[in-house]
Amino acid sequence: MKSRTVALSILFAALAVVIALISLSVGTTKLPIADVVEVLLGGGRRGTRLVVLELRLPRVATGLLVGIAFGVSGALLQTLSRNPLASPDIVGVNSGASAGAVAVIVLAGTGGGNISGAAAKVGIPLAAVLGGLIATLIVGALSVRRGVVDAGRVVLIGVGVAAAANSLVAWMLVIGDVNDAGRAAAWLAGSLNARAWSDAIPVLIAVVFLLPVAMMFNRDLSALVLGDDVASSLGVRVARIRLGLLVIATVLAAMATAGAGPIAFVALVAPQIAQRLTRMERPPLLTTAMLGALFVVLADLLARNGLQWLRVGPYELPVGVVTAACGAPYLLHLIGRQQKGR
């Protein structure tokens, strides 16, 4: 790993920690950062520990983990397809995962906007992964031309699959109980509000197991950037590696979606910025992971407190609104750059 890549990874990780500490300290009850650090080290007063450990830390931890998962998923998909627009929120993975999760929220709902503990802890993540895998399977199968994945078709077919999945979601919201549908609609905006440890733990498990596995294939990813024929000549088992990494990318995106909803554009923006800053031929996984974590916790800090700081009112925005506001212009920039390159 290049020294520049390592340095940027450390920088983004440090910035993410700083923003996380600030996020833990601000809110209705403002706390000195020193008190927050004391609580995290095992000390602090009982009331402070309650605010930090039970109310705020699950939200911040979920944001960090979701950012890592989305970032790595986007980096893998963009590398495998050799297309900077191939992120899970564009090619249909997030939409498929959302359809699966919403099915559990609406169909397993109690009518009061809540679902049973077992369905929430197990059903939503599993349904999200299943929905994401189905969407990926459809996009992958329809994007192959003459035995090779067509990078242009990936995005076009992905947009179509996403539209179909979003239509299914809309239908479930219409037929579902109004309280369950309202909960699902709020979740679909991409929000870290009221996150609990039960939301963070599944994403943590996915990141802890799958990120190291993905990083084991760094050399294979670099070879795949050169083309399938070159990668095969270098000894890479292209079909097997591509399938395995595609499954990893899908599971990471689906688990992140299950944990916080389909937070837009994190998987698109983080890999591209990391690639530009590191000057590599592809998005580096570790740097992208740290940048994704930084992006989400910073966006959540602004979503939670931005309107109050501007004296607009005591309102909180979904984090997906902030990431979309940042990511949409960058998407247009990427499309414009691709058009100029033709």
Regions found by a protein language model. Give the residues of each.
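Alpha-helical transmembrane segments in inner-membrane proteins
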Residues: 1-342
